[in-house]
Structures are given as structure tokens and as C-alpha cells.
Regions:
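Membrane-embedded beta-barrel scaffold of Gram-negative outer-membrane proteins
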Residues: 306-312, 316-319, 450, 456-462, ...
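Structural signature of Gram-negative outer-membrane beta-barrels, strongest in the C-terminal barrel
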Residues: 346-362, 385-515
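C-terminal beta-signal and adjacent terminal beta-strands/loops
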Residues: 562-565, 624-626, 647-711
Length: 711
């Protein structure tokens, strides 16, 4: 905290000492409105959304791929983390057992893993947020630190590495130009929920700075369900010259979360507030800490060339008390990216070329200790080791825009491997070894065709892959399985996007077909032990639809606030099946992948009024979900609604006050917000498949924003 305060004071003194020049004053006068005008600056036609994930800035409607964008306005609906925002993306199934137990699947990828998010890459700007084990966590990401999210559905990004499920890119929030701003917010809610946040930002012509702090705590609805998180975020952008700029991002979080774990069907029906008995006895918890930093430089070179480079550090440490053992783990990742790109225009043709490399290294130390009697007392060491992993991606991409047609071709070349050193010498098994995976070439080809005005068709072919983690490569005897192969998939997509009725309507329709081969299936060999095996293939097919509609309201001027009614609808229907899978002499071919509903739907209706009053109604539904490979048991489908009402007003044109109240799970639906697939069970102990979704609960929030517009 002392270091943070020192950084805050140094930057603050530097920024306050800088004065905008006359040229900047003129620009500011033309582009920056007063605080009252900013309240009304809502585009009453749907704005043209820009996509930058492919490193070729363009409009969403003309992008040749399945991409979804979550704006800052939508992120404001996520109180604790980005879970509720991501759940509105068609193709994503987001499950939240507790505030600290989150699982995301994208187009069915990773559905068979009982916990956590696998085979989907997450980036915070250019900083990788996934671990050496290939796992991504979402529960410690504060939506207030973000300006938008871009979701690439399917293995479509040769630039970020063609991950099997897709890529999620978080774009950090930054200070607004020529505005000094202080924000304070506080929320209180049911089940002991409490949140405080504060941020300071200052934007000047040559640099801008944003510093934010946040704290969240909750008693939880269930037993052994307390949660506490503190986090900070710093984002600074510096313009060194007309051609050279730099960006620094620094963020960290500290979480203390109890674990109630999943429950069986009888407990779910009769005593859903109870924790699993063994987790309650040991007072199970997880204590993850994380800090990450990244610095990037961008240089505009002669003849329309641009060079950029970035480096990152990502440090994490966690302690987890579980009924079967204690886990202590720490990881330190580092790496960087180098990228060159060039744009050339000739007549009606525009060519955009880029090439670069991503480097990722991580060292992980972990140990398992006995939990004596499952009562929470740490015992003797059972396992200890060190893992070093590397991933190198070389990529290139060429985009050609020829009148109404855009053709994009790209390729990613991946080299990956790891070394494991077994530091536990009390047994006869030595798990030490090196493993270098066969290099993988993942191409991408896409075509976008502007058939009429704002109507576009696109098609793409992509190859994706997923590298096995260390735990997946170890055999039941603890030896490295050198026969295991990376998963691979070819994905075929087609889609249609249109902006209609004077940009009041936006439609996004996508079809996809993906076949995953060398399918890595996690096989449970103990309550906490899974090993991987290549087990045939799976088939993933689906349709995804997004509709945005301004029902009432049009923009007449920047200074007027008008009545507006906006609808957002997202729907996905899919068929995910084992195509060829046999385990323990049982043939599961043709069965549905467990953990995935056939249909999901989310929608919202937003009302805005000239007097500052606004409301939002949200609805989310899910079809029933198969709970095991046999498809012999299903969880019930559900429909959950929420409603929010708020009022915005200003004092002295500089202070904006926003007060809201939200009712979550409006109808008090009893549903499973997360399921644990293939949960083990016996005749005396039924399988614990279910996490309970919270009953009806309330939050009240007060936001204060002070803005000083520089002249």
C-alpha cells in the first residue's frame, strides 16, 4: 500500500503540473461537452462498434468471424465480476457456484471439466491471464477496470494463439481526454454483501493516468460461504512524441473465500443453504493472490509501418484447504510480444499485413500436504514439484479489401513443452521428465462480402488446438504419458450481419460446425485426481443470434435527453455430442456432452428518460443439462429475471449522482447455477452435482462522479 501511495503521489504531482497548450484548448472546446450534456450524449441510433482483436481496426458488422463486444455500459451491470456480462454472449455458458467458483464454456469446449475454465485464452490487453495448466480464472476481475470486452467465439485468432474454444480480450479502462475525474461508489445488499470503490483519473494531451481501488465482501447464503476481495488497478498512457507512445498496466487482487462445495439432489431440494459435510468439517477455503503488470510501446514508422512490443509479468499464489489435502501453489509467468504491421492503399484495394511472435514462460511450484482426519489440520507432505512451461507462437496475417469483399488469411505456428522436477523423495515414484509437444500449424481463412449497404455475409475456416496440461499428461501411476496428444479441431463458420432501419436495428447470425479430434477427456481416479486421455472425437454444431433494437427514441441533438427504449436479445441453440468415445468398455458415442444445455437465451429491456430516471429488465434462461456421460441424469431448466431502477442527477454541473436499486432473481427461482459433471457417488453417498443459485436478493448502489473539464 505504501508503494501504491507513492506511485499515486508521484503521478499526481506530474499530471497536475502539466498544462494543455492552446491547440489542445481549441480541440477540447469542440469535442468536450459539459457534464449535463454528457448525460444526454447517448447515440439514439445504434453506434458503429469497432473491433481491434484481429489488429485490423474495423466495424463489427464487416468482421469475418464470430465476435461479440461487451461495452462499458453493459459492464456496469456486473456488480462483482464480469460473469453476468459474459453470460449474455451467445455460445458462452457461464456457471457461477459461488463468488469464487466460476466455470465458463464456449461452444461446448471444456464442458466435461468439473471445475474451472479450460481451453479458452484470456488476455488483459496484451497480458495473458491463463496459467501453465491452461486454466483461466474470472472471479477476480473487476468490471470497473474495463472499457470493453471482445469475445472471439471459436478458434479464430492466429494472433493470440488459436485456442480451441476461443479468445476473450479485456480492454483496460483509461482516463478521458482533458478531464480530471474522481469516482466513489458504494453498494450494500442481501446476505452481507458490501462493496466500496474509488478511482482517480486525469487525462492530458501527453499522458493520462487512472488509479482505482475496490473492496468486496459477502457473508453468503450457504454455510461456509464467506467471501472477501480487495484489488487495485493502475493504467498510464504516455505520448513521448508524435510517433512513439507507451502504456503501463498494473493490477492486483487478494481473495479470501470459503468453499461450501456442491451438494446432492436431496440436500438441494430440502436444505440448499447447507455446505457439503466434508467441506464444512474442514472449514474449506481458498486464498488466491495475484498481481500482474505489462508495459507496451508503439512506434509509427515511415511508409505506413507500425512496430509495437510489450512485456508482461504475472505472479500468483494460492493456498487451498480441502477435505482430502492442503494445496500450496505459486506461479510466476513472464513473456512478451513483438508485432510489425503495414498498410498499403492502391486504388480501391487496401492491404494490411502483420507478423509477430508471442513468448510465454511460467514456473510453477506446488505441494500437497495431508489434511489430518479431514478436520483442517495440516499434516505431512504428500507431493512436491516444480514445473517450467514454455509456449512460442509465430504468426502472420494478410487482409485484402477489394471494393465490397474482404479476404483475410493468417497462420499460427506453435511450439510448446514443459519440464517437471519431482521434489518429493519419500516415495519410489519419480515423476520428473521433459515433454516437448509436436509443433502445430494453425491456419485461418475468412471472407466478408458487403452485399448491400450495411448488410454483410461472411464465412471462415479455422484450425484450433489445446495443449495438454501437466496433470493431463501424468498416468494413474504418476508417470508422464508420452503418448498423449494435443487436441485439434477444424471449425467452419458462416454468418450474416446487418444494420437496418437507419441503424436502429442490428442483427448478428452465426452458424458453426466444429469437429474436435484427439479429444482429451479428464478421467477421475480419486476425489481430487484427474488424468487425461485421448478418447476419440466430439462434434460441435450450433446457431447463435444477437438482436439489438432501438424500439423508441432517436437522437436529435447532443444537448437533449429523450425517452428511449432499447432491447437486447441473445439466443443460442446447439448440438454437442461424443462422436467416438469409449471408456471402461462403455460406448458413449452419440451421447450429449455433459454440462451443456441445448438452448440458452438472455435478453434485456432498457428504458431511459429525459429526467434521468432509468430502468432495466433482464431475463436469462437455460435448457436442462445432462450431468454425466451416460446422460442418465439431468438438471432442470430454469428462467431467472432481474430488475434495476435508478436515477441520475447533477449538482453544480460537476458532480453527478447515480442511485440504483436492483432485485436479482425476481421470481425467487430455485435453480442450479452450476453443475459438477460426472460427480462420483456410491450407494451410501449420492453424487454431489449441484450448486444453488442465490434466492431473491437485493442490492442498493450509490455512485458519485466529480468531473473537472479542462479548457
Amino acid at each position: 500500500m505504501k508503494l501504491l501511495l507513492t506511485i499515486f503521489l508521484i503521478h499526481l504531482s506530474c499530471l497536475l503540473s502539466g498544462q494543455p497548450n492552446k491547440e489542445t484548448k481549441a480541440v477540447a472546446a469542440d469535442t468536450i461537452s459539459t457534464a449535463n450534456e454528457r448525460l444526454s450524449r447517448q447515440n439514439y441510433n445504434l453506434p458503429e462498434i469497432q473491433i481491434t482483436a484481429y489488429r485490423t481496426s474495423g466495424e463489427l458488422k464487416s468482421t469475418a468471424g464470430s465476435v461479440s463486444v461487451i461495452s462499458a455500459d453493459r459492464l456496469e451491470n456486473s456488480a462483482v465480476n464480469i460473469v453476468s456480462s459474459l453470460s449474455t454472449v451467445p455460445g458462452i455458458v457461464m456457471q457461477e457456484g459461488t463468488l469464487g467458483t466460476v466455470k465458463l464454456t464456449l461452444r461446448g469446449i471444456g464442458s466435461r471439466y468439473p471445475y474451472g475454465t479450460k481451453k479458452i485464452k484470456l488476455f488483459f490487453g496484451d497480458i495473458p491471464m491463463y496459467s501453465a495448466e491452461g486454466e483461466t480464472t474470472f472471479d477476480d476481475i473487476n468490471p470497473e477496470y474495463l472499457s470493453r470486452i471482445e469475445v472471439l467465439r471459436g478458434p479464430a485468432s492466429s494472433i493470440h494463439g488459436a485456442s480451441l474454444g476461443g479468445t476473450i480480450i479485456l480492454y483496460p479502462r483509461r482516463a478521458e481526454f482533458n478531464i480530471e475525474e474522481i469516482k466513489l461508489n458504494s453498494s450494500i445488499g442481501s446476505y452481507g454483501y458490501f462493496k466500496n470503490g474509488a478511482s482517480y483519473s486525469n487525462g492530458t494531451p501527453k499522458n493520462d493516468l487512472l488509479i482505482a481501488l475496490s473492496g468486496i465482501q459477502s457473508e453468503g447464503y450457504r454455510e461456509n460461504n464467506k467471501y472477501n476481495r480487495n484489488s487495485f488497478f493502475i493504467n498510464q498512457n504516455q505520448l513521448f512524441s508524435k510517433k512513439l507512445s507507451g502504456n503501463l498496466v498494473l493490477s492486483g487482487s487478494k481473495i479470501r473465500a470459503q468453499i461450501p462445495s456442491s451438494i446432492d439432489s436431496a440436500t438441494f431440494a430440502n436444505h440448499p443453504q447447507k455446505a457439503a459435510a466434508n467441506w464444512l468439517n474442514t472449514k474449506g477455503y481458498e486464498h488466491p493472490d495475484r498481481i500482474f503488470a505489462g508495459y507496451s510501446l508503439r512506434y509509427q514508422m515511415p511508409r505506413d509501418w507500425e512496430f509495437s512490443s510489450s512485456v508482461f509479468l504475472n505472479s500468483r499464489k494460492t493456498e487451498e484447504n480441502r477435505p482430502f489435502n492442503y494445496l500450496d501453489e505459486s506461479g510466476f509467468a513472464y513473456g512478451g510480444r513483438i508485432l510489425s504491421q503495414h498498410t498499403k492503399k492502391q486504388g480501391s484495394t487496401t492491404l494490411h499485413f502483420l507478423a509477430g511472435t508471442n513468448l510465454y514462460f511460467e514456473n510453477v511450484r506446488s505441494s500437497l500436504s495431508e489434511n489430518i482426519g479431514g478436520k483442517g489440520t495440516k499434516g505431512v507432505l504428500q507431493q512436491k514439484g516444480k514445473e517450467s512451461i514454455y509456449q512460442t507462437d509465430l504468426f502472420t496475417q494478410l487482409e485484402a479489401k477489394i471494393k465490397r469483399i474482404t479476404i483475410t488469411g493468417g497462420v499460427n505456428f506453435n511450439l510448446s513443452g514443459f519440464q517437471y522436477i519431482d521434489q518429493f523423495t519419500s516415495d519410489t515414484i519419480n515423476q520428473s521428465g521433459n515433454y516437448n509437444f509436436t509443433s502445430i500449424l494453425a491456419p485461418r481463412l475468412s471472407i466478408s462480402w458487403n452485399i448491400l449497404n450495411d448488410i454483410y455475409f461472411y464465412t471462415s475456416v479455422n484450425k484450433g488446438f489445446s495443449i495438454p496440461s501437466l496433470s493431463e499428461t501424468l498416468s494413474p501411476l504418476g508417470l508422464i504419458n508420452r503418448d498423449i496428444k494435443p487436441e485439434k479441431a477444424w471449425s467452419f463458420e458462416g454468418g450474416f450481419r446487418a444494420s437496418l432501419l437507419n441503424h436502429a436495428t442490428f442483427i448478428d447470425l452465426a452458424f458453426y460446425y466444429m469437429r474436435v479430434t484427439d479429444l482429451i477427456v479428464p478421467k477421475r481416479v480419486a476425489e481430487d485426481v484427474y488424468v487425461g486421455m485421448n478418447a476419440g472425437s466430439s462434434l460441435h454444431r450450433g446457431i447463435e443470434v444477437t438482436l439489438q433494437q432501438w424500439i423508441i427514441g432517436r437522437k436529435r441533438s447532443d444537448t437533449d435527453r429523450h425517452f428511449a427504449l432499447i432491447a437486447n436479445l441473445n439466443y443460442a441453440t446447439n448440438r454437442y455430442n461424443f462422436q467416438n468415445f469409449t471408456d471402461n468398455n462403455i460406448d458413449y458415442s452419440g451421447n450429449k456432452l455433459p454440462g451443456m444445455p441445448d438452448q440458452t437465451f438472455s435478453g434485456s429491456l432498457d428504458l431511459k428518460t429525459p429526467i434521468g430516471f432509468y430502468t432495466q429488465f433482464e431475463l436469462n434462461t437455460s435448457d436442462k443439462i445432462p450431468l454425466n456421460d451416460l446422460n442418465s441424469q439431468y438438471s432442470k431448466g430454469w428462467l431467472v429475471m432481474s430488475m434495476k431502477a435508478g436515477y441520475i442527477f447533477e449538482i453544480f454541473k460537476k458532480l453527478k449522482i447515480d442511485a440504483t436499486i436492483k432485485i436479482n432473481n425476481l421470481t425467487d427461482e430455485k435453480y442450479a447455477s452450476m453443475v459438477v459433471v460426472n460427480a462420483p457417488g456410491t450407494s451410501s453417498r449420492p453424487p454431489r452435482y449441484f450448486y444453488l443459485g442465490l434466492p431473491r436478493w437485493f442490492t442498493c448502489t450509490l455512485n458519485l462522479t466529480y468531473q473537472d473539464f479542462k479548457k
